[in-house]
């Protein structure tokens, strides 16, 4: 539920009316906004909801939770927060940009969505740093890499995300535009306010964490290559070479980071491009909505990446299902005994 969406919606009709074929352009925009986009977001919402609930349930029910499990569980929770706002976004799109759920819910949904952006970026960054220490310097900061400390770190990241999202809690509200449509938007009337807020959100959620994430993985790749060369020269197994399980976890986190970059980069680039545009073009309008779909799609893709890339999840799912079945059978047995 991005605050920029409402302004984009209201400029789209005017923009398309100036295109080659007014009637065709208007009909196309209407179909895209009220049918195609809501349908796409609806599919993403359904898939992501099931997948992320499955991941959270699997980790919570696991007897042995690792440090990466805690980070992945928090990412899944963040994705669920992201998905919670999707039905409201679908409804607003389907009604031509009109918000009918009232001001308080507009503020809550918009603020939680922004908070999720901060949380995802922060968790992804800290998880990348954790992978660096687990792989390259496993004996450093060991007292911080415990399950208890990791839970506290993640709680701190969530608290910081709520604080960073305070401007959205204050300024997001239902706004009535010139065409009479009331939309849930971010009430920034000054161009300077729009500029500073866009830079603030883009830098803190993408351009600041991105270099940290990339540095961590460049160092990991350099270390892995160095260990490979040492093994090749010595023609033996070096005990300092990372274990296969650590490498699998690192590979999984690396793929998650790549998905994070590919899904978030288009949206943030378009936000910066918008600052330089006096009148959005049709290409910008289409690109903006595609970037929205990409950002939401990552919430659906992530849980399946956890399952496909992590051997632990593939082993845990049948075990948890078996334990749940056994528990259900025992409960049925106890119920039958109580009746006889």
UniProtKB/Swiss-Prot annotation:
Residues 1-39, 91-104, 176-200, 274-288 are extracellular. It is found in: Cell membrane. Residues 61-69, 130-154, 222-252, 310-340 are cytoplasmic. Its main location: membrane. Coiled coil: none annotated. Specifically expressed in the brain, with highest levels in cerebral cortex, hippocampus and amygdala. No expression detected in the cerebellum, thalamus or hypothalamus. Keywords: Cell membrane, G-protein coupled receptor, Glycoprotein, Membrane, Receptor, Transducer, Transmembrane, Transmembrane helix. Pfam families: 7tm_1. It is a multi-pass membrane protein. Signal peptide: none annotated. GO terms for biological process: neuropeptide signaling pathway. It comes from the Eukaryota. The chain crosses the membrane at residues 40-60, 70-90, 105-129, 155-175, 201-221, 253-273, 289-309. One of its GO terms (cellular component) is plasma membrane. This is Melanin-concentrating hormone receptor 2. It comes from Homo sapiens (Human). The gene is MCHR2.
